[in-house]
Amino acid sequence: GYITNFGKAHLEGFGGVEGVIKGKSELYDHLIADKKFIFFNADDPIQLKKLSSYPGKFGYSSLDTKNYKIDLLGAHPFVKLETEEAIISTQLIGSYNFTNCAAAVLIGKYFNIPMEDIKNAIEAYVPQNNRSQIIDKKEYYIVLDAYNANPNSMEAALEHFNNLPGNAKVVFLGDMFELGEKAIEEHQNIVDLVSGMNFDKVYLVGQNFTKTRSNFTKFATFEELSGFLKNNKLKKGKLLIKGSRGMALERILDYL
């Protein structure tokens, strides 16, 4: 078994981050009870602590030489990583995708898949379904990451987009769902983060974002946004589109 991370997702159902950690850790509890094998990120202190005394594990790390070493070489914009045997250049944007790639390498290694095959498979993968997609559309360079969103993934996407070279950057952010009583607080945290970044325009879409304190342009519904886009052509440049599945912000592409 493998757990990717313990983040701020599904807070409504789990009652907070501690509930997320407890719920996801039940996978570890089950595997340990049955003496099964666990793959893990040895650079994650939560995973490392929970598995410290369990022998049936195989981890990757950029720091700890007791585990299989995998380093992030860069994400400008695509993730490039170095294993003990190869350098892998992916078609996945953002350093936040490094752990996904590293886990794929680790599991492949455990099952004795040749590194050349692991490298070729990861390098050939092109993201689809609104997940970390790069789209060149007319005069726009678009980062489409509208499959889903939570505070951690939204923060990571924004930091990556902010660090891309060039100017004329426009951001569309849709509501994050399943945050329960933390919804407005977490949306305000995102707005505060964006306020310190260098974007030409920021458009917020959804009931939660409209309740935040900011000077950004807000739309309570997608229909309000689409009406705006019909009458206001965006300048040539880079666009980030990020939101939860229920917001379906990929529809923005129809108005460009």
Where would I find each of the regions flagged by the language model?
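Glycine/threonine-rich flexible loop motifs
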Residues: 12-18, 154, 180-185, 250-251
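Short glycine-rich anion-binding loops that position phosphate/pyrophosphate groups of nucleotides
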Residues: 7-9, 43-45, 148-149, 176-177, ...
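Acidic, Mg2+-coordinating active-site environments of NTP-dependent enzymes
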Residues: 1-141, 166-167, 192-195, 199-201, ...
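Active-site beta-alpha connecting loops in nucleotide-dependent enzymes
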Residues: 127-130, 146-215
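Thr-Gly-centered strand-to-loop micro-motif
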Residues: 90-92, 143-144, 173, 179-180, ...
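ATP-dependent carboxylate/acyl-activation modules
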Residues: 129-131, 246, 250-251
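Amphipathic, non-transmembrane alpha-helical secondary structure
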Residues: 25, 29, 155-162, 188, ...
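Active-site loop-to-helix "anion-binding N-cap" substructures in soluble metabolic enzymes
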Residues: 204, 219, 244
